[in-house]
């Protein structure tokens, strides 16, 4: 049996360095892909796509059917421990949320914003509203289960927009999902469910009008 030599040590050290380099390279590629996807989704969600050709190219890069059925879910977190005052702490919480959504919902496309995570999910328009509502609650429970390992004081909340046909209409669902998340506490107070974790815009009823007008005077009248 040959003895362990200095050359063996050098070979092992070189192998470790090579592995570290490969892991670093893969991480850098993944981060670039996330950034690239984030920029594309930002343009689609904010209605900045200016042509059919651009839409087709974006759909191809995202590996999405431009004519498919989708809905937008906007995730946020609420710290039930101490108030979030430090911006770095808030960003850390959003990073934890992003990781939780990616782990539990590997099939959705994710756009990261400053204070929220936006998920684009394929949707079946033939399912009933009750079925969709149940699915959304299950999604929140899954993400919340993942978040408890990060910080037990962080509560996941989500607003859900309508199902739209075609990527070009995603801004409609995105606006609804954002409005639903913004009004989740108010809606919970009205419904008597203070512990609301998910709100579908379609469940707002007449309160949809509050989100669909930019006229301050009309809002005062309501």
Across the structure, where does each feature detected by a protein language model lie?
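Cytosolic nucleotide-utilizing catalytic cores of signal-transduction proteins
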Residues: 9-10, 15-222
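Regulatory loop-to-helix N-cap segments in sensory/regulatory domains
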Residues: 2-9
